[in-house]
Amino acid sequence: MTDPITPGIRAYIDSRRIADDYDRYFHYNELFRFDTQVLDRWMREPGRLLDLGCGTGRHLVHFAARGFEVTGVDLSEHMLAVARRKLAAERCSATLVQGDITQLGGLGLGRFDYAICMFSTLGMIYGAGNRLAFLRSIREHLDAGGLLASHVHNRWHNLYYADGREYLWSAFRRRLRGEPEAFQKDVDGYRGIRGISLYVFTASEIRRLLAAAGLALDELLYLNHRRNGVLRGLFRGLRANGFLLCARKPDGTA
């Protein structure tokens, strides 16, 4: 199977500079406030929560303070070091695991009531088969009725700027040629890292992917341009600046 972590993503993971500057860089990102509000609505009752690709721990601190039993997994030792300092500063408790989220079966994590995979972490996994296997693995780590929340980028939002339209045109040409991962988006040079790319979804595609993983979609929110609220109205599938999703492991399933 194709390696789920591309060299560019691995360089991002391994960068201490990225980790140490992460919270400052994203301080004014409105999605970081809005997604927390949405998660609080979806996950009202404290329980066991697994944060996949937890980064510097913004959700770990928040949910630990709410009384959740939280576990964070990230491959970056530098991100986890920042998360550990933030948890200590807030006198919050969490289990931190340095590991590959695409290999959950080998981490001995147990079962959870909730799992979150935020800020396009799902799109950072390369390969359709790898993304499906990852979601199926999450399902295996949820108790029956357990919830998964995630954020992904919207492919069609690329229509609104020139570089995005060029990406779409190139992607469709790759698709016609039968190339694998035709809609993988090159973001080379992002934060000074060469070779970064990520997968961007359509609403219908994310619905199909969740169904194939055995997860029932509870809610799909279309994000407005500033990603600080829900987009409504006509053609929102084309206009949305990404999606927040909540899916459930059906009751009565192992």
Task: Name what the model sees in each region.
Residues 1-53, 58, 62:
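Conserved class I S-adenosyl-L-methionine
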Residues 58-103:
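Class I SAM-dependent methyltransferase SAM/SAH-binding core
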Residues 106-114:
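A short acidic, Gly/Pro-enriched loop at the edge of an enzyme's catalytic core
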Residues 114-129:
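A short SAM/SAH-binding and catalytic strip from SAM-dependent methyltransferases
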Residues 132-144:
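A short glycine-rich, Lys/Arg-flanked "PGG" loop and its adjoining helix->strand segment in the class I
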Residues 149-209, 219-226:
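SAM-dependent methyltransferase
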Residues 232-254:
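Core SAM-dependent methyltransferase catalytic element
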